[in-house]
Amino acid sequence: MDQQKIPQATAKRLPLYYRFIQNLSLSGKQRVSSAELSEAVKVDSATIRRDFSYFGALGKKGYGYNVNYLLSFFRETLDQDDITRVALIGVGNLGTAFLHYNFTKNNNTKIEMAFDVDEEKVGKEIGGIPVYHLDELEERLTNDIQVAILTVPANVAQAVADRLAYTSVHGILNFTPARLNVSEKIRIHHIDLAVELQTLVYFLKNYPQ
């Protein structure tokens, strides 16, 4: 299957499916229906079947989906056997939380290093991860580091993103409120926690369950 032809909305749901299939496999379950998947991941059955259809016949009508087959398929599709090495930039409260968490439920993603300008943090380890001065950014980001997490103050986010264009980084997960302009070689995902919270509150008030 040509990955370019898969809708981005479908691609964003694949890790969600994979996480649930992993849990099913660990529990010893052998097969699962689209209805069970729907209930667990809160995506309607029709959408799940359509998502899966982009990859061919993953299941059988009346039987559902073989859990081990799905696990193997999604592991390969999501490159779960390849390690994604990550750098975190900005070791404030949120950044520190990321360093302690370090994707403990995702064995193929690992924060390898962090950067900050606070002399009390530079040269130390947080969660077992070394913290370097931001001045060392270009020197430290080698070809092994593909993704950067930005948890810096909004007023310096663009400057940091500009510098990342000259490193091995090809993806940025931006947790700042700033909307960044990046080079074509970099894909950026914005996660504004304040906006997400405001959206949730709006839905709670206007679309009560």
From Swiss-Prot:
InterPro entries, per the entry: CoA-bd, NAD(P)-bd_dom_sf, Rex_DNA-bd_C_dom, Tscrpt_rep_Rex, WH-like_DNA-bd_sf, WH_DNA-bd_sf
Binding of NAD(+), residues: 90-95
SMART domains: CoA_binding
Entry function: Modulates transcription in response to changes in cellular NADH/NAD(+) redox state.
Keywords assigned: Cytoplasm, DNA-binding, NAD, Repressor, Transcription, Transcription regulation
Record-level GO BP terms: negative regulation of DNA-templated transcription; response to redox state
Keyword Oxidoreductase: no
Top-rank taxon: Bacteria
Gene: rex
Predominant location: cytoplasm
Record GO cellular component, one term: cytoplasm
Name of the featured protein: Redox-sensing transcriptional repressor Rex
Subunit annotation: Homodimer.
Disulfide bond positions: none
Known DNA-binding region: 16-55
A molecular-function term among this protein's GO annotations: DNA binding
